[in-house]
UniProtKB/Swiss-Prot annotation:
Name this polypeptide is given: T-complex protein 1 subunit gamma
Chain's role: Molecular chaperone; assists the folding of proteins upon ATP hydrolysis.
Statement: the UniProt record of this protein carries the keyword Nucleotide-binding: yes
Any one cellular-component term (Gene Ontology): chaperonin-containing T-complex
Organism whose genome encodes this protein: Encephalitozoon cuniculi (strain GB-M1)
Pfam families associated with the record: Cpn60_TCP1
Keyword tags: ATP-binding, Chaperone, Cytoplasm, Nucleotide-binding
Gene name tied to this protein: CCT3
Length: 519
């Protein structure tokens, strides 16, 4: 008898649209209050007990929010907002959530006057256009000076643990991006061309960028060469073993010598593969799958170093740095498949682990980054800091424009909105409310820096912005200063931040019902 198909029940929550939108604003405000103290150079650290019972010490907005177990769908969408910001530009994860929550909170006052959400969303779209123009007006071009770039990257991680421990994350991030960045295509594929290796123990200052590839693999034979200059490298995808049948195979032997002959045929097949490889005179054979003991001994006799069972991602990076082209089987090997761009192969020890290091490459299109630290928790946090820094460095290369930091860009947007006259009463109020919401960033920077009266400082900042759009908050001292000499941020970070915040608010304002699905 056929089992009955389980039915789903849909429960429509019987709330009024205005009540649901107000609840969304409350949920957003609650989420933002968690990370309110994580903004600026005086940011506080959070100790997070993760879902797998490990401890993280961090002030990264995305790292904190992703560990929260929240029930309200609007709160979940804000957590996704932080993740998107982190994936796109690597910085501004805390700012985007704070902005979105504050803008949504301000819009609820307009909703209370029975203004339709669609009219508010339309006005928000117009306000976003004005904000982008304000950022464009405040933006300055980035010169090719490396010191300026490092200063900007360091500014994005000024509140992180790497700055407290004096680890040169900015230098590492810039060096890594320079190796991976393709100027002709204006692209920087960090995911496929860069790998971070965390090494427990050693000096923090020993962290480095390898101009090649670092692979955590042992050499198969203990007597194979461990240091090779200008190696010829061959990459093979198929195993160097006897090819077994696709399905289960049975052999029947009628004579005593047949079994011996079967073993000889297996050996001959492996020898043929090895002879084909030896024919192109390689120094190193990298195999994606296994290498049999017989093949291993043949390679060793011919002074060839063998590596087996490597990940596809490692093989892809190795191919890019040494110029080798992977082949599916040894029979296809030709001279053009041999990689000769690598200058040095070493089998070295980092901490307690052994690595195969391919360095001194002529035209490296990939790199490995070694991060060292005293404990696992610090290593994990340093890796997060580095990934944030490297994404900021990437945005600098792809879009070489800068904005004044310290809340100056937000105040410039607020000033522009206050100067703009809306086409109707709703637009005018949306502009005014959004301008008020944008001041949340400099306000929190002032609070976190320990200023006694933030409201007085904000009033002074508003007056200064009549003189120029580059005045902001010194997050360390709480003073109102010209931020062009203090802190600059990538244009991509600021534009992405305001776009994401406004779009998220528009999405939440359009929600007028919540449907729960239960089995």
């Amino acid at each position: 008898m056929q089992k009955p198909i389980p039915r789903k029940m849909y429960i429509l929550v019987p709330d009024k649209p205005a009540q649901i939108q107000n609840e969304s604003a409350i949920a957003a405000k609650t989420i933002s209050s968690v990370i309110r103290t994580c903004l600026g150079p005086r940011a506080m650290q959070k100790m997070v007990l993760t879902k797998i019972n490990s401890i993280e010490l961090t002030n990264d907005g995305n790292a904190i929010l992703r560990e929260l177990d929240v029930a309200h769908p609007s709160a979940r969408s804000l957590i996704e907002l932080a993740k998107t910001q982190d994936d796109e530009v690597g910085d501004g994860t805390t700012s985007v959530v704070l902005l979105a929550a504050e803008i949504l909170n301000e819009m609820t006052y307009i909703l209370d006057r029975d203004v339709h959400p669609i009219r508010i969303c339309k006005a928000l779209g117009r306000a976003l256009e004005i904000c982008i123009k304000a950022i464009d007006g405040a933006a300055i071009s980035l010169d090719s000076n490396e010191e300026t770039k490092i200063k900007i990257i360091n500014g994005s991680v000024a509140s992180k643990i790497c700055n407290i421990l004096k680890v040169p994350i900015g230098n590492l991030a810039l060096e890594a991006v320079k190796k991976v960045y393709v100027k002709e295509e204006n692209k920087c594929d960090l995911k496929n061309n860069m790998k971070v290796e965390k090494v427990l123990g050693g000096n923090l200052m020993e962290s480095e960028v390898v101009d090649g590839v670092l692979i955590n693999k042992d050499i198969i034979h203990p007597q194979m060469r461990r240091v090779i200059e200008n190696p010829r490298i061959v990459i093979i995808e198929s195993p160097l073993e006897y090819k077994k049948g696709e399905s289960q195979t049975n052999y029947e032997f009628s004579k005593e010598n047949d079994f011996t002959r079967a073993l000889e045929i297996e050996e001959e097949q492996v020898r043929e593969m090895c002879e084909r490889i030896i024919g192109v005179r390689p120094d190193i054979v990298v195999c994606e799958k296994g290498i049999s003991d017989l093949a291993l001994s043949i390679l060793f006799e011919n002074n060839i170093t063998g590596l087996r069972r490597l990940k596809k991602t490692d093989i892809s990076r190795l191919s890019k740095v040494c110029g080798a082209r992977s082949v599916s089987r040894p029979e296809d090997l030709e001279e053009r498949h041999v990689g000769v761009s690598c200058g040095l192969f070493e089998y070295i020890k980092y901490g307690e682990e052994y690595y195969c290091k391919f360095s001194r490459c002529a035209h490296p299109k990939a790199c490995s980054v070694v991060i060292r630290g005293p404990t696992k928790d610090i290593l994990d946090e340093l890796e997060r800091n580095f990934m944030d820094a490297v994404k900021v460095a990437k945005s600098i290369f792809i879009s070489p424009k800068l904005c004044p930091g310290g809340g100056a860009a937000e105040m410039a947007m607020a000033h522009e909105l206050m100067q703009s006259a809306g086409d109707n009463e709703v637009e005018a109020e949306v502009f005014s409310r959004m301008a008020s919401a944008l001041t949340i960033i400099p306000s929190i920077l002032l609070e976190n820096s320990g200023v006694f009266n933030p409201l007085e400082a904000i009033t002074l900042l508003e007056q200064k912005h009549k003189e120029g759009s580059f005045y902001g908050v010194n997050g360390t001292t709480g003073e109102i200063v010209d931020t062009r000499d203090l802190v600059l941020e990538p244009y991509a970070v600021k534009s992405q931040c305001i776009k994401s915040a406004v779009e998220a608010v528009s999405q939440l304002l359009r929600i007028d019902g919540i449907i729960e699905s239960k089995r």
